[in-house]
Each structure stands twice: as structure tokens, then as C-alpha cells.
Amino acid sequence: MEDSTLSKIFELNTEDLIQAAIENGEGAIASNGALSLETGARTGRSPNDRFIVKEDSTSQLIDWGDINKPFDAEKFSRLWDKVDVYLAEKNRYLSKVHVGAHQDHYIPVNVIAESASHSMFSKLIFISPDEFNPQTKKEWQILSALNYECSPEEDGTNSEGCVIINFAARKVLLAGMKYAGEMKKSMFSVQNFLMPEKDVLPMHCSSNV
């Protein structure tokens, strides 16, 4: 646990995150013992609110259009800073995870979440390693501010919520998104972009042998 001038950053295990989520009023324990949460108006991914920052490393490699919508790099920086200031006034939850298990292809990610439940989700959907980033790779960062409200006129988003991937900055911004699955989809999109550049074919599947 690290003291901040305005709030605190908590790095908790799953059990403590569940307790924190309950204490914060984020959800309740269901009859089967699972933590039950509400996702708000969005019960799944929100494709119309998903963007990728268009910059030198991506401009010629991504099929831009209705699915991969471009986002201005300067607008991203301004919005990231606004969300960062918003989170600095609140208690936040840190998860240090790996996306992928292979030592050559995993991505180390620091997840900073406004809610304990989003932090817990990141620890469960990704890998919580015994040793974080042993290959000392460049780290990615996810900011998840589920209660933040974007201003489409000022921020360039399509609604009060957004999911924006910035490959050059190695950042993913989730603002106004209570559906935690956007974290998984965003980082899978990152892997699906980066791995073919290494002659590795990513597969969205699983197998028990």
C-alpha cells in the first residue's frame, strides 16, 4: 500500500479485493458465493466507443474504418491526463499482471482501477505472476475509471464512455465503462496486432488435451 497526497493506491489479493468491493458498494455476494456486479447500461462490449490512436507506428498497418476508429494522439493525451487527475482524488487499486504466459510474448501490464472489482477482474482474466516482468520488458498501463464521464464535444468520444488503445504510448484508457470485459478485449487486440509482426499467429481459442 502506497500513500498518495490525495488518496491511496491499494495492491490487494483477490480475497481482499472482494471485501473492498463489498465495502465500497460495488456489488454483493450471490447465493452461490460469487461476487455479483452491475455493469450499468452496457452489458457487453461497446464497439462504437472503441478507438485506436492513429500515429506513425499504426497509421499504415491498421485497417481504419467503422471497426477500427482512429483517435487523435493529442486528444488522447489530454483525456488521459484528465482521467489521471480524476483518479488521483480517489482510492485506486493496482494490479500487476501478464497478458500471455510465454516468456517471449507476454505483455507486462500495470492496471490502475477506480474500483476494486475491476482490479479483481484484471487479476483473474490475466495472469498474476509470482514474479512480475522477469524479462524486464517495456510495460503497458491501463487506466480504468468506470464512473468518469467523457464529454464528446471536448474529448472527441462518441458518448460519455470510451475505450482507447495507444500503441505508441503503451496505454489503454477505459473511461465511463463499468463492463470490465473491455480490459480483456483491449489487451487481446493489442496482442493480435503485435504478435503477427513477430510471425506469431494469435488464436482466440482454447484446448484441453
For each feature predicted by the language model, list its residue ranges.
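Glycine-rich phosphate-binding P-loop
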Residues: 207-209
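A noncatalytic interaction/capping subdomain that flanks phosphate/NTP-handling catalytic cores
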Residues: 1-205
